[in-house]
Amino acid sequence: MWPNSILVLTVLLISSTLVTGGGVKGAEKGVCPPDNVRCIRGEDPQCHNDNDCKDQKICCYWHCGFKCVQPVKDSWEQ
């Protein structure tokens, strides 16, 4: 019972981190903004990495696909 509880807790913690989008780095430009959109199907990617983006934007999973978006300040860094 104990190992199963640890596994469930670990999975919940990881998935909550992925859903909020926190901590996804975009070089030194900032981090990806939170994306709470639930998708039925994904869109074709508009970028594959930050080098594909212009105007200080970064490549993030945003609204069902990878897109160049304006980064936000990382609230964990002071």
UniProtKB/Swiss-Prot annotation:
Disulfide bonds: 32-60, 39-64, 47-59, 53-68
TM helices/strands, residue ranges: none
GO biological process, one term: antibacterial humoral response
Keyword field: Antibiotic, Antimicrobial, Disulfide bond, Protease inhibitor, Secreted, Serine protease inhibitor, Signal
Annotated InterPro entries: Elafin-like_sf (IPR036645), WAP_dom (IPR008197)
Subcellular location: Secreted
Domain WAP: 25-72
Keyword Protein biosynthesis: no
Gene3D superfamilies in UniProt: Elafin-like
GO molecular function, one term: serine-type endopeptidase inhibitor activity
Signal peptide: 1-21
GO cellular component term, pick one: extracellular space
Described purpose of this protein according to its UniProt entry: Antibacterial protein. Putative acid-stable proteinase inhibitor.
Name of the protein this chain belongs to: WAP four-disulfide core domain protein 12
UniProt organism field: Rattus norvegicus
Gene that encodes it: Wfdc12
